Amino acid sequence: MHIQWDTRITTLRQIIVTIICLKVVDIFFIILPYKEEWTMNFENFLKPRRKKQEKDQNRIDDIKSKPIPKHICIIMDGNGRWAEKRGLPRSAGHRQGVEAIRDIIKITSELGIKYLTLYAFSTENWKRPKKEVETIMDLLVEYLNRELDNLHKNNVKIMTIGDISLLPRKVYEEIEKAVNKTRYNTGVQVNIAINYGARSEIVMAVKEIARKVASKELNLEEIDEKLISDHLYTGGIPDPDLLIRTGGDWRISNFLLYQIAYTELW
C-alpha cells in the first residue's frame, strides 16, 4: 500500500536533517578537501535553515520575556483518528503521539514552565480494544526505556497522577523506575496522568477526608477548598493555567475537573 506521508512528518524529517547539518558544519570543513563549489553549495543549503532556527529561537526568547504559565496540561487525544484518516493503523497514530512528547518536554523546559501534565491514559480507556490498550502501554514502556537517561540528564522530574497500581506489571515497574530516578531533579515536573479519572480522584479525596473526620484527625470546620485540593493526586501542584486538547474536541473528558476551574482552554 502506498502511504501518503503528511506534512507534519515531512517537516519533522526536515528539522532533523537541519539539526544534524548545523551540528556537523564545522567538521564538514575540517575533514573534507577544500573546494569552493562544495563550500558555497553547503552554505546556500544552510542559510534558510539557519534563519528558521534563529526565528524559532527569537520566538522563544520573546515568549520568555513575558509572563508565562506555571502549569500547562495537555489532553493527548486524536492520535487514532489522525492515523485512520491516512489509512494507517491506529497504533501508528499513538506512536506519533508518544514521539511528540520529547519535543513538548523540551520546549516547556526551555521556556521555564515548571509543571507539565500529560493525559496519557484515562480510566475509561480500558474499554478500548485490548490490542490498542496493549499498544499504548508498550509504547509508554518503550519511551521511558529510551528517554529516561536523557530526561534525568536534563533535570526533568517525572511524577504520576492516577491509580498506577492497576497497570500491567511491566508498565508499573518502568514508571516507578522513572519516578525514583528523577525524584530529586529540579527542572520541569512532568506529571503523567495514567489510569486517571477526575471523578474517581474526587471520590478518593472525599473518602480520605471523611475517614479523617471520623477518626477525629480533622474537624468538619477545617474542610475548605485548599484541604480538598491537598487530598487530590495534584496536591502541592498549582492549578493549570492552560489546557490544550490536541484532537480539537471541545470537552474536558473527566480530566482535572476540580483543578481547572479558572484554566484557559485551547
Language-model segments: residues:
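Accessible peptide chain termini
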Residues: 1-2, 40
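Extracellular/periplasmic metallocenter environments
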Residues: 16
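Flexible, compositionally biased loop and terminal segments
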Residues: 26-266
